[in-house]
Amino acid sequence: MKTPKKSLAKLDIGYGGTNTRYGQIRGDELLRELKGKKGITKYREMRDNDATIGAIMYATEQVLRDVPKIVKAVDESDEAVGYADYVTSVLDDMEHTLDDHISEALSSLTYGFAFFEVVYKRRMGPDFKDKKRHSKFSDGYWGVTKLASRAQWTIEPSTDSVDKKTGDLLGIRQASSLLDSANNGFIPADKLVHYRTTTVNNDIYGRSILRNAYKSYTYLTNLQAIEAIAVERELHGIPIGRMPAEYLGASATDDQKSIRADFERMLRDLKNNEQGYALLPSDLLLDNEGKSTGGVAARLVDIELITSNGTRNIDIDPIIKRYQHDISRSVMAEFLMLGSSSSGSYAMSKSKTDLFLRSMESYINSIYDILSKQLIEPLWMLNGFPVEMMPKI
């Protein structure tokens, strides 16, 4: 392999590949409904409305909140242990707990990314007049007041959020920001803790873990709606009304049109369970000789509830379960579906659960790595601590 020219060795010649031209959120996404803020809304809908996805996210949050938090000193010397204790004290001196922050950081799994603004403080003790400097500690070191969540749906597409060549994060712009108007809602990258599920193409918005479940979710939602409609029609039926043709024609008089409108309203109210009875005229339809025509058609005005004859025996439940399995499988959480059928074994259950826990381990390790890189390192620089003594979460 040839040695690169010294004039080029330090240059970043190529580009990451992420579409940053218009500052759009996920500009490279193939599906229009998952691009930009529409995508944020759709993933939020999936997270909040689907029972299977809700169970997956709840299980993930509860498992990861219970993971012990350990600050590892660089060695066993008193100095190194002292610096590790400082980091522990920082995490314990925020307005919220670290568990609460992790719970919020896990929103990056749903949306692909999560931003938190770091609010720093001088640790001046619990009795200091300026509340912004309140702390359990009075050592004067820099600490952290809070890691303030910046909700995904408040992030505005912005051409100045990323470096157009490298794709590196420069900052984020919030809608209706309460920041200083001079900043115009822009929060620079050095004030942020930035979580994302993947760094492919250096896309700052990552990739939602629900992306591969989107198709199954769409079909599942449609089938559940169809199932509910089918059950309703089977139980309640569809009201059918009959009245003389002259009431329905274009040449109907105003009185006939008024009667027709009242009749249509009656049918609609019966369908919506807003009306408990229907009062109809008892007049019969007569032939040319003035005699009743007989049968159901003998009534001049009539209402009938039509129900299914049960001839279409399509069991929709297995189809719904298949899509629920697909959603769980897409995030290795298929163990949640165990017991929904007669098949399966303990060995299979343990294998699926172990796979899920392994994936959870990678998520929590990623969160701790980002905290070490984007929170502890800046604190180290602010306090002027020796870099070689910096511990890791």
Language-model regions, residue ranges each:
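N-terminal-proximal low-complexity accessory segments that begin disordered
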Residues: 1-65
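C-terminal anchoring/interaction modules
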Residues: 1-18, 22, 265-298, 381-393
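Structured, mid-chain assembly/scaffold modules that mediate subunit interfaces
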Residues: 41-214
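Short amphipathic alpha-helical segments
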Residues: 78-86, 90, 94-97, 101, ...
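Short coil/turn segments at secondary-structure boundaries
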Residues: 102-105, 117-120, 232-234, 238, ...
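Conserved catalytic-core motifs characterized by acidic clusters
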Residues: 155, 172, 294-306, 343-348
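Extended, charged amphipathic alpha-helical segments
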Residues: 195-326, 330-334, 338-339
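C-terminal helix-loop subdomains that flank or include functional centers
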Residues: 314-393
